[in-house]
Amino acid sequence: MKQKQIFKPASVKTPFLCVLVLAVLFTAAACKQSAGSSGGGGGYTPVPYEFAAVPAGVIPGTAPTYPMPGAQDFYKGVFIAGRTVTLSAYSIGKTEVTYNLWKDVYDWAVQPENGYRFANAGQAGSSGNGSGSEPVTKVTWNDCIIWCNAYTHKMKGEAECVYRKSSSDSTVLKNATDTAACNAAYADMAKKGFRLPTEAEWEYAARWENDHTNAEQYGSVWLTKLNSASGAKDKWDTNETKEVAWYSANSGSKTHTAAQKRANALGLYDMSGNAYEWCWDRHGAITADSETDPQGASSGTNRVKRGGRYSDPDSACTVGSRGNGNPGGTSDNTLGFRLACRP
């Protein structure tokens, strides 16, 4: 098992650090156990999925002072100058959701007694004939949030499902073809179920860099520079991108089995390249307002996608690059997702 990387601000004293280490390890173990136990007995062996724990943090934004792929705002991520983001502790998947895991949950979810409905069945990798260990693709954002509820229902019970009809109506969402309901979906972050990461959670995890290599300081934490792929030790237009990402220069125009490239400091794979990843947030301009656990724009149609894809140039696979897509209409063979959850 890959060793967890531990958050270690320079000012932390030894007794506090020991408590923090124990808390992080406990969170990781709890989330992993939840994703690896069926909750239903009967000798069922679930498809494994591992998480990395991310402790709470305060991230004061800063402007890049180094070369960037372009001057556009979409290269600059969410931790911009003048903005401070406070994040609660969470866990995030070490890999993109594979087709094997997707299909296992999908087949359970669509049984009449479980009542879930999807717009798309998903496929194995970019071709549809790939390995089951490649990321699932051809799924909309709507499909993903309904699948997250189904996975939670299957593994933890329906009560822990995150995605509900509204803040005042706790009905669990189960139908990805109900565009209006999905568009109005409410994320109950008090629940322990599986969900999409918020954009800030995604970027924080993608940029985690605790040995200060190719990183900038944001308060008490160090984050990979905006101009680099996740886990890369140099900027986008160097061979380092090939070490951590599948993209246009090395992918052969297709997805690949998860976790074949070097992981980042949190032990996360393919945060850059391979498949684009849906996030929870509505897409919109990032403002300098300080926020706690931000969830994106308050209005708008498109949802955020991050990380770039196997067909993109290196510049689109940087940790600061932001993308977006239609949540009910975008389901192509370059787009998948990974999971997050609260401890």
Which residues does each PLM region occupy?
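Functional-site microenvironments in short loops/helix caps that host divalent-cation chemistry
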Residues: 143-319
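A short glycine-rich, aromatic-capped structural motif
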Residues: 46-117, 135-153, 205, 273
